[in-house]
């Protein structure tokens, strides 16, 4: 079965104002000044570590946030965690920053920290969809599909056009043996994204488990040809192998 879909790093902060004037906020020089003010300071530099100064630039949090996104997208997840933590020192009520730090934690394999940050993001803005989907994926990886379904369903409630939530919920229904619900969700995915081949492939597997062999054969054969048309030979061969294993 093709795996769940996640979300990428959020690229910008919301327009919410920071709770305090930046001139009154203290942050750590080695990280914040290096990023926000462009000073080339190392954390281990004598006389610098632990020194506290005032950042007076009104764009500093946005600049640090942008550097965190850049670090995360480059795969430097530990650095991204540090940068987003600095932003949260300035604005602890930023759902996007908690989400991004959660994603960095997730990429580092720190699932508990990731789930905690996704939870904080949701608590700050219950209508912000990405943390529901990513947290649901983590629950799914832990085989806690019932809790995962709750997160995916909440995402769908707030945004009925979020195809990733339907797709991931379908996968959890599949893992629970609830094949009719899985097929229904794959159908919804294909209404929103008719070209999403993985949903057709997974629906074919669900049809097979539900005893609907003709529909299963049709979906798997269609997905195999679609993969080939896109130049994805590996997925093409996988679909053919799956049909052979299932006797289709």
UniProtKB/Swiss-Prot annotation:
One of its GO terms (biological process) is receptor-mediated virion attachment to host cell. It comes from the Bacteria. It holds the Pfam family TPR_1. TPR repeats lie at residues 61-94, 95-128, 129-162, 163-196. One of its GO terms (cellular component) is cell outer membrane. The keyword Repeat applies. Disulfide bonds: none annotated. The keyword Transferase does not apply. InterPro entries: TPR-like_helical_dom_sf (IPR011990), TPR_rpt (IPR019734), Ycf3 (IPR050498). Keywords: Repeat, TPR repeat. Gene3D superfamilies: Tetratricopeptide repeat domain. PANTHER family: TETRATRICOPEPTIDE REPEAT PROTEIN 6, UDP-N-ACETYLGLUCOSAMINE--PEPTIDE N-ACETYLGLUCOSAMINYLTRANSFERASE SPINDLY-RELATED. This is TPR repeat-containing protein slr0751. It comes from Synechocystis sp. (strain ATCC 27184 / PCC 6803 / Kazusa).
């Amino acid at each position: 079965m093709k795996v769940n879909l996640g979300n990428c790093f959020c690229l910008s902060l919301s327009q919410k104002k920071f709770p305090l004037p930046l001139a009154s906020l203290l942050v750590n020089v080695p990280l914040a000044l290096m990023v926000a003010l462009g000073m080339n300071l190392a954390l281990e530099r004598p006389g610098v570590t632990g020194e506290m100064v005032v950042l007076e630039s009104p764009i500093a949090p946005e600049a640090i946030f942008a550097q965190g996104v850049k670090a995360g997208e480059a795969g430097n997840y530990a650095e991204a965690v540090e940068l987003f933590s600095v932003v949260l020192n300035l604005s602890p009520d930023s759902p996007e920053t908690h989400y991004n730090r959660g994603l960095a934690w997730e990429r580092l394999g720190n699932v508990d920290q990731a789930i905690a940050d996704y939870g904080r993001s949701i608590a700050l803005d219950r209508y912000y969809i990405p943390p529901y989907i990513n947290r649901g994926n983590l629950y799914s990886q832990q085989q806690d599909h019932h809790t995962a379904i709750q997160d995916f369903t909440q995402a769908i409630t707030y945004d009925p056009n979020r195809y990733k939530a339907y797709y991931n919920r379908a996968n959890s229904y599949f893992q629970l043996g609830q094949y009719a619900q899985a097929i229904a969700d794959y159908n919804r995915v294909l209404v929103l994204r008719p070209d999403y081949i993985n949903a057709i492939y997974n629906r074919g597997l669900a049809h097979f488990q539900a005893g609907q062999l003709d529909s299963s054969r049709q979906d798997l054969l269609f997905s195999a040809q679609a993969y080939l048309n896109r130049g994805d030979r590996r997925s093409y061969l996988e679909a053919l192998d799956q049909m052979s294993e299932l006797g289709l």
